[in-house]
Amino acid sequence: IIGARVAGISAVQASGQPGADNASLSIRGQSGIIYVIDGIRRSASDFNGLDPNEIESVSVLKDASAVAVYGLDANGAFIVTTKKGQTDKVTISYTGTVGISQNAEEQEWLDGPEYAYWYNKARLLQGDTEVFTVDMVRKMREGVDGWGNTNWYDKVYGTGVRQHHNISASGGSEKIRFFTSIGYLEEKGNIDKFKYRRMNLRSNIDAQLAKGLSLSLGVSGRIEKRDAPKFSADPDDWMNIPQQVCYALPYVQDTYEYNGKIYDVSTPTSGSPVAPIASIYDSGYNRSNQSYMQSNFSLKYDTPWLKGLSLKFQGAYDLVHGMTKQLTKPNEVMIMDLPNAATTTLTYHKDYSVLKDTPILSESASRAQEFTTQTSITYDNKFGDHSIGVLLLAETRERNSNNLGVTGTGLDFIQLDELNQITGFTKEGKEQPAIPSGSSSQTRVAGFVGRLNYNYADKYYLEASLRHDGSYLFGGMNKRWVTLPGLSLAWRINNEKWFHATWVDNLKLRAGIGKTATSGIQPFQWRNTMSTSPNSVVIGGASQTAIYPSVLGNPNLTWAQCL
């Protein structure tokens, strides 16, 4: 929606999976967009996770002079303000929508006989013998002797259902105002077994504590749950289900009976065999559960001794917990044997799918917390036709995260899919101990901002800004900090006395220049990377592990700057 309504914004949707269809936004072809929600910088996932009913307004900053004040990696900015309570009686609102989702354009596929016709044509052009005979084509239409006529597209794709509900309450008095919102979103994909659920909660409270002293407190949270088969629908993933639909051959049946049991059919390709139906229902699962809590606190004091002078402190604390669980489930399929010129009856052989014959269970957990502080002084006043605004701000951001996970092989009972049931052995009896993993990280950035706004008679505008940013990504005081200036001039033509076009209510000419900076590197590349090598040296008659610099650091790394 934003991409269609705001000039210079392009949106590219790379996936249609429930809960993963967020568009990638760019401004005038440039990435590096930041998102500021209620004055605090947030991630793209936080922006995408907002309930639309919580949003009061969205502003877009597109040029360098406007975003220079936001510093690190800011080539453009979305400024989001969430709803606040009004001085009025309590109002309760409900909105709800239910819709369906289908592929925008139904693809046309060759059926079995058509595939046979064009395959034979290609063989003849190469000087080879035809493979498919008239009798084979007849059997495809009749579905006998192992032949079939399956439209895998119709078998896999259906109709998804999307529902969204929100209830909110707002109100207040001169002293205190509130806004509270609860939302629920559920999406079921047009491929079965894909499901996304999200619950949003937001509460904003604004209070006048004393004359000139105001308090704002915002608390929000959301829970996101995703369910999918082990094979995803992401176009970048190996053996994704839409890809399997494209590769599956149409002249087979979708199921095959063998020794009194019904199996899903798999067809060979130039790589691994594909079995779209089995990949949806029998490959296992991929589940995730993410919990987000965000708080925003600000205290503002309008000084009585100087009109227009305000002091403000704003802080935010974010906490994220994540859990994922993946089960790779072995499943048997009937793999079709490719026909040749001597084939009369299409044959199949029973084997495990591409996921092999041993179950694999993986679980991981993550935790991240982020602290943001902003201390600012602002001055806004008007002297006749002259308006002036000054901002001085200091900002810090710190993020700490931890991740751990375990992958185990072998389960005696696939229904008991818990890590304490892992056997550590493959079906053939080969030992494969559980593999643990873990990591942690810490990031810190700081910045100082100065900005001057001036306008004369609401016709001529000047804005100048200067930001001094520091990042943990670079070493040494000479490389860690960067200074980012910005300057813009504007002329509101429609406010001139000689402008009489009443049908134009806002005509503005603006020019700006500014410097932005991006990091674009992994942490600690300014230091040497040390690696270990076992059994590299002998000390005291015993082999020892050696430590050596595998990658030399570059102490001269610094910000990539753009004017």
Descriptions of predicted regions:
Residues 5-8, 16-23, 33, 76-77, ...:
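Residues embedded in well-ordered regular secondary structure
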Residues 4-5, 38-68:
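Short acidic/polar hinge/loop motifs at secondary-structure boundaries
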Residues 1-4, 13-16, 22-29, 38-46, ...:
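Short, polar/charged loop or turn motifs at beta-strand boundaries
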Residues 13, 27-31, 62, 82-84, ...:
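Flexible glycine-/small-residue-rich
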Residues 163, 198, 204-213, 218-223, ...:
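Extracellular/periplasmic, surface-exposed regions of secreted and cell-surface proteins
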Residues 2, 9, 58-59, 78-80:
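Non-catalytic regulatory/gating segments with a bias toward low-complexity or hydrophobic composition
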Residues 41-42, 130, 262-264, 387:
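Short, solvent-exposed loop/turn motifs
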Residues 12-21, 48-53, 70-74, 194-197, ...:
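Short, glycine-/polar-rich solvent-exposed loops and beta-turns at beta-strand/coil boundaries
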